[in-house]
Structure formats: C-alpha cells, structure tokens
Amino acid sequence: MFPTGDSAGREGTVNNMPAGFRLQFLQSRLKKRSVSTGSANRTPKFCQASGNPLLPPYLCGRKFLSMISRRNIRVKVMQTLYAQSSLDSATPLSNSVAHLQKHYEQTRQLLVFLLWTLTEIGRQVEKHALQKASKHLPTEADLQINTKLAGNEILWEIQQDTTLADHLKKDQGARHGMENLIKEIHAHLLESPTYQQYIAQPSRTRSEEKKMLLQILNDQMIEFEPYVEWVEDHFTNWEDDAEAILQLLTQYLQKPGKLSGQKEGVSFQQLIPADKWNFGKELLTTVIEKNEHLLSLIVPKLKNWDPERIASLDMILMKMGLAELLYFETIPPKVTLNEYIDLAKEYSTAQSGQFVNGILDNIHKELAEAGQLKKIEFRKS
C-alpha cells in the first residue's frame, strides 16, 4: 500500500497493521461475496449454483468479462498521482504514464507468482517423497509417500505453458528464499482432510484435479498467514488486486496452458484489456494537464480549509473525480461521485468520504446548472 494522510498531514500505511489483522482485513474483503446456504454458520467451500461449481465462495456469481474493473484502474491512477505529488512538480507526463504502466506490470507479476506457487507445491510433494525414500533406513511409510498431486494433470499443463515460462524468466525476485515457506505450505497441506481424501482416491478426474488446486489456492495459500505476509512484502498491490487476480487465476485453471491468449484460452491481456488501459492513461493525463483548471474549481469550495493542510489523497481524489465529471462524457455523474466517495473512505481518513462528497457534489450541481457538463445519456445495455 501507499501512505495515507489526514488534514493535519499525519501519514501511515496499512502494512503497519499487525500481521494477523492484515490477514483478517484481506480475508474480509475477499470473502464478502460468500454464497449463503441458508444457515449463518454454514458456508460452502465452492459455489453450488449452476455455471461453475469449482469457484471459491467469494467469486460466486461473478462474470469474467473483464478481470480488472475501472475501480482498480482508478486506484492505480491515484497511486501514480500520489507518488508524483511527492516528487518534483515538473515530472514529465511520459514519466507518469510509465509509472502507471509499472502498476499494471505488478498486477501481471502477482498472477505469475501465484501460478508459480501452485506448481512449486506440486514439486514439493515429489521432493518430499524422494527425501523420505532416500533415508539410510527408510521405513515402510517412507517408501509409500503418496505423490498423486505431483502428477496432477492441470499442474502439468500449467508447467507446459510457454508464455508463463517466459514470464517466469523475467519475474524472479519474489521467488528467492521461498524454499522453507513452500515446505511449510506443503506440511500444512498434508494435514488437510481434503488433501487426504484426494490422495485416497486412486482414480483421477479432471474435475477433482481442478478442485484440489482451488482448495490449495484457498486453504493453503491465501489463508496461510506466512504466505500472505510474504506476498504483501513483495507485492504492494496485493490488497488492491487480489480479488481480480484470483478471478483470472480461477478462470485459468478451467483452461490451463493458454495464457498466451490462444482461442478459448486466458491471456494476460484479459487482466488489463486495452479499454481499461486507455481509461487509466486518459484519466491520469487529464488530471495532470488540467491540474490548474481543476484546482480553480476546487479551492473556492474549501472555505475555511487551508488547501496545504488537506490530506493529499483527498485532493487527488477530488481532482480525479472532477476530471471524470468534466471530461469523461460516458460515465454517469452518480457513478463518479459514488466511486470517489468509496475510495476516499477506504484509502484516506475516516472523514474523507463525507468531505470529498461535499466538495464534489457542490461543484457537480453548479456545473450542471451552468450547462457545463456534457454527458451522453446513460442507457443500460
């Protein structure tokens, strides 16, 4: 995460939370869409509704039309503008766009890392069995370690994805020093009743192979605190991108081996398609190029507030919201206002949502009355 501040300029980071709280915070965000089974204390491990029974509960009912939403893009633009605000104001526009591209690149790197973790857990199953069998005096149990997961056909297809292999060659930083953590995840997996049931079945079905990998993803990876801490330490975008990444990863496991974007496959372009990239770039460049005009509309509404003492994120969000109201004619004003109120509540201070809402709503009403908002009538498709 990036720093946040209040009106007095005090700043901190979400990563300063205790590790256990960070884990609970992330899980509450990811699982807020869990499917109800009619009982307050029963939550299915996978969706039972028609369409895709293999999805984890927090993804039930979601459509995989676009992995990254405009909200995700707004967050990345916000982060880019925040980073720029702490640098020389004369930062070239091209540098800001390149910085935004780095945020997109982090999203891709996170997806690659999660896929790599899955394959490494499979490899650890085989390594563990070989180590046991290679003991000087192996026991009968040492010689009969079940390696079914190592032969999981989905894992094999992932490892044969040449596009993924190319990305793995470029993204090696977060993987250094992971050996012990992979062993911990593997040890945790061995104690799982679901895993014991999986290896007890001598036969294989593609459905069960997929289901086992999704169980590992949910129960042994994103719910394992040491792993989440590792991801947080190496990927500052984890909390912002986790849900979208897990959507794409879940979809990829339905048709593995096609991250190159082949027909009916899953591509990295689906994660951040061209229209989302263009939206982010246009929003970023508009806020930078129209900065003085945006400030001329915002500052008079601050009344008793000193612009220098307003939380920097609040000012950034107000400029972004106003830029959307003025220059993005296909986005309904209500959508813009609601989005930036939510972002202010989540990323800035406790009072920021109300503050940003008051300023933007005031400006919106004046612009609408003056006929300065050029919006295309919004129609639901």
Kindly label every feature range from the protein language model:
Residues 2, 14-19:
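Low-complexity, glycine/proline/serine-enriched flexible coil segments
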Residues 6-12, 30:
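Compositionally biased, low-complexity intrinsically disordered regions
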Residues 8, 21-24, 42:
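Short linear/disordered segments characteristic of secreted peptide precursors
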Residues 13, 34, 50-60:
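Intrinsically disordered, low-complexity proline-rich regions
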Residues 16-17, 32, 38:
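Alpha-helix boundary/capping motif
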Residues 25-28, 33, 46, 64:
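Cationic, low-complexity basic patches in intrinsically disordered or flexible, solvent-exposed regions
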Residues 39-44, 57:
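Cationic, amphipathic, low-complexity segments that mediate targeting or membrane/lipid association
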Residues 62-381:
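Class I Rossmann-like S-adenosyl-L-methionine
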